[in-house]
Amino acid sequence: MEELYHPKKVEQEAQKFWEETDAFKVDEEPGKEKFYCLSMFPYPSGKLHMGHVRNYTIGDVISRYQRMQGKNVLQPMGWDAFGLPAENAALKNNVAPAKWTYENIAYMKNQLKLLGFGYDWNRELATCRPEYYKWEQWFFTRLYEKGLVYKKMSTVNWDPVDETVLANEQVIDGKGWRSGAVVERREIPQWFIKITDYAEQLLNDLDKLENWPEQVKTMQRNWINKSEGVEFHFKLKDHDGDLQVYTTRPDTIMGVTYVAIAPQHPLALEAAASNPQLAKFLDECKNTKVAEADMATMEKRGMDTGFFVIHPLTNEPAPIWVANFVLMDYGSGAVMSVPGHDERDHEFALKYGLPIKQVISVIDADEVDIQEKAITEKGILVNSGEFTGMTSQEAFDAVAEKLTAMGIGEKKINYRLRDWGVSRQRYWGAPIPMMTQEDGTEVPVPLADLPVRLPEDVEMDGVKSPIKADPNWSKRSYNGQPATQETDTFDTFMESSWYYARFCCPNLESAMLDPAAANYWLPVDYYVGGIEHAILHLLYSRFFHKLLRDEGLVDSDEPFKKLLCQGMVIAETFYREDPSSKKTYFNPRDVRVELDTQGNSPKAFLIEDGQPVIIGPKEKMSKSKNNGVDPQELIDKYGADTVRLFTMFAAPPEQSLEWSESGVEGQHRFLRRLWKLVHTHVEKKGAAPLNVAELNETQRTLRRKTHETIKKMTDEFNHRMAINTGIAMVMELLNELSRFEDDSPQGLAVVQEALETAVLVLAPIVPHISHGLWRELGHEDVVMNAPWPQLDEKALEKDSIELVVQVNGKLRARIQAAASANKDELEKLAFDDENVQRFMEDKTVVKVIVVPGKLVNIVVK
């Protein structure tokens, strides 16, 4: 065995062994307990960043631990390969998105291998490959046949110069990123999947997810946002038709003083036809962002249409206003407005001088001037005719009953969740498998004609999608008649909503899934990824799983049993500000930090010019803050095991991990020390088989530390996952080993057990060095196939224990006692201590309190 630790050599040997033996290949083994561990697959952006490294290290550590528990472990890896960044990179580098994507995949795959992640590469998939998206297209046609897919008009960002649809991130300050033109809102037909049909299931089944973070479940509950309310109609005054609204507060119906409609509402368009000012206002609204977050903060603006509704219960007229905060996509595009009891309605009414009426009074609340502030709480009805005096809950039911009896309303459950719009007017995505016949009817592409292939050898002009620009690409035939292929592509969340299932049978050519394989592996036992995916990805995956279940492809209700959301990797930021407050950020490696003589008040200087830079807050590693660290450089300098060990030691998985070069160096020293201890031990030769009965007290103490380490690591893996505290325990064990000087046969046997334990419990975290050291410790088998060390509870028992002795609650002595000592023996030992006797002189003992294993407290006066 070499005396010094050479990470590169050690890691190459281990990786060569895993590659040559296909060590992580797994198949279904009925009768053997399975464990499916999955980390969210990456977008192939070009290089791994530290966020990737942390995510995949956590997943690999869990997988390797479960393998040592004797389970059949599946840990696959693939690529979420479609998306807008590939189109942008293609333009920038003058290369086709496909070529750019496949080159990135090759580079990043090699990086993952260098980090020693135990993936079954036989199952690798890339979502941009036709053999993958073929089955997504087929599944979409099945949903269409079941009535779960439909097409409707929907609002998009339209660039009038480039004549193209822009993604939200391509709209910068209201202008197109490429043309600089003012972006318009435009209605175009788009495909939707009826996720709302599954809203109740998606909500209720959150209760089944016992091992998901409560925060994620709350975010999904709020996103689905089930509400009970009343849907009813206002008749229009001097106009045919009516206006449908939904409210969760029918108790406030007598306080309606106006109705607000969306700028795209047919009534708004009708009114604008004879009102140029209103037409201009509607045009301005076209350029308004429609994200809810934007709606909440933007200025509320509106205009009177000149139309009125008739209040269904008072028969009084109320004006209809167009308001820029009402969305056509939500409900019917109209809302009843009660400014006395809704803050947004109140703000709008004050701005435009609309009446404000109080119909709710809150008992025991301070008097509120309704003209100054809305009362949003529930309470007792006032000024409400026959409903006056009722509580809000009583009025809810009474108003609902009255509107139902009148035939103009009914109680209704509503969800904030909207159907999933899956159309994207981009090129680099899976083509939507629908065709339009000459008579305008839509038909799904038959299975025999799938996949609808995306051409990969294309030139990008930055304006139109190549498949939209090529008139020949969309020419198809259906039953011998001409048809036009849909040129929109799927939202990339489609691909990531079922990839976890395809990993169960990625090479199956005849079907989307093999139910036998899928039902053996699914649900995923442990899913690791960032909290930023709490809503969209995790909600869509749960939805897709239920769709797969209803198609008979899987028999479980939920895709992921346990979810771990890892924290961010954060690092220091350094910058300079120019006179216009524009910040230029510098990488921490290019900065020198100096402390004063007391080791405080840090100051930072740019190494290049020696001039000061501002020390900013610690923030998530990112390109924009220039505070990232290239994992490749760390692997080259310290080795993959050091990077993995730092990642697991610096913080528990759910918390933010603060980057520290000195911390990385510390972990590297620890591994060198482990290597040296094993080297010193194996050079001695002469360990006898361990005989517990023969051990002396010093040997038993070291063995106790060994088994305390096993207990701690096992507890952390099985419960809290605070592996950092387990690693700290291994460090303590190595400290004990460094101090242990006993080369007798049983002394060496205890050291052998301690070193084997250290190597085994660290094997999931630092697999390369463990692979090498396990062999050096005399084992024929490989450490990855070794079982997890067994805890000997007897080894944890202590012959003697230390107790604290207090006199009147103050510490006066520490005493050693036999672990088996009874209460009387402990009392005698305490009274015999000289220091204790000094504090009891000339005093009377009132009582003695003994807490076995901890303390003796003598109360005197």
Curated annotation (Swiss-Prot):
GO terms for biological process: leucyl-tRNA aminoacylation. This is Leucine--tRNA ligase. A motif ('KMSKS' region) lies at residues 620-624. Its EC number is 6.1.1.4. InterPro entries: aa-tRNA-synth_I_CS (IPR001412), aa-tRNA-synth_Ia (IPR002300), Leu-tRNA-ligase (IPR002302), Leu_tRNA-synth_edit (IPR025709), M/V/L/I-tRNA-synth_anticd-bd (IPR013155), Methionyl/Leucyl_tRNA_Synth (IPR015413), Rossmann-like_a/b/a_fold (IPR014729), tRNAsynth_Ia_anticodon-bd (IPR009080). HAMAP family: Leu_tRNA_synth_B. ATP binds at residue 623. PANTHER family: LEUCINE--TRNA LIGASE, MITOCHONDRIAL, LEUCYL-TRNA SYNTHETASE. It is found in: Cytoplasm. Signal peptide: none annotated. CDD domains: Anticodon_Ia_Leu_BEm, LeuRS_core. Belongs to the class-I aminoacyl-tRNA synthetase family. GO terms for cellular component: cytosol. It comes from Hahella chejuensis (strain KCTC 2396). A motif ('HIGH' region) lies at residues 42-52. Keywords: Aminoacyl-tRNA synthetase, ATP-binding, Cytoplasm, Ligase, Nucleotide-binding, Protein biosynthesis. It comes from the Bacteria. It is an enzyme of class 6 (ligase). The keyword Aminoacyl-tRNA synthetase applies. NCBIfam families: leuS_bact. One of its GO terms (molecular function) is aminoacyl-tRNA deacylase activity. It holds the Pfam family tRNA-synt_1g. Gene3D superfamilies: 2.20.28.290, 3.10.20.590, HUPs (3.40.50.620), Isoleucyl-tRNA Synthetase, Domain 1 (1.10.730.10). Its main location: cytoplasm. It catalyses: tRNA(Leu) + L-leucine + ATP = L-leucyl-tRNA(Leu) + AMP + diphosphate.
